[in-house]
Amino acid sequence: MNILGMKLFAHHKGGGSTANGRNSAGRRLGAKAGDGQEIHAGSIIYRQRGTKIHPGKNVGQGGDDTLFALVNGVVKFERLGKYKKQVSVYPAEEAK
């Protein structure tokens, strides 16, 4: 049927679907304390998945690989050989 140049159809084809359209929020990983920063015992230094940075002196590692300070002091990021990095916390009087 053709009325004034328009075609009328009995049905309209479906629009279909897509597999895209989702995204997850970022996990807020990374450094939470900088090199040379004074922190308290129990403070989170670095959030990570796996051991991207290894725990050094006075630093503990949580079940999710988060690094945290065991003592009050100053944060120090250091190289551990050619390819690895570690973070240590030195007591304030020892760091000066």
Swiss-Prot record:
The organism's place on the tree of life at top rank: Bacteria
The keyword Ribonucleoprotein is annotated on this UniProt entry: yes
GO molecular function: structural constituent of ribosome
Keyword Ribosomal protein included in the entry's annotation: yes
Cellular component terms (Gene Ontology): cytosolic large ribosomal subunit
UniProt-listed GO biological process terms: translation
Keywords, in A-Z order: Ribonucleoprotein, Ribosomal protein
Region feature (Disordered): 13-33
Family note: Belongs to the bacterial ribosomal protein bL27 family.
Protein name: Large ribosomal subunit protein bL27
Gene: rpmA
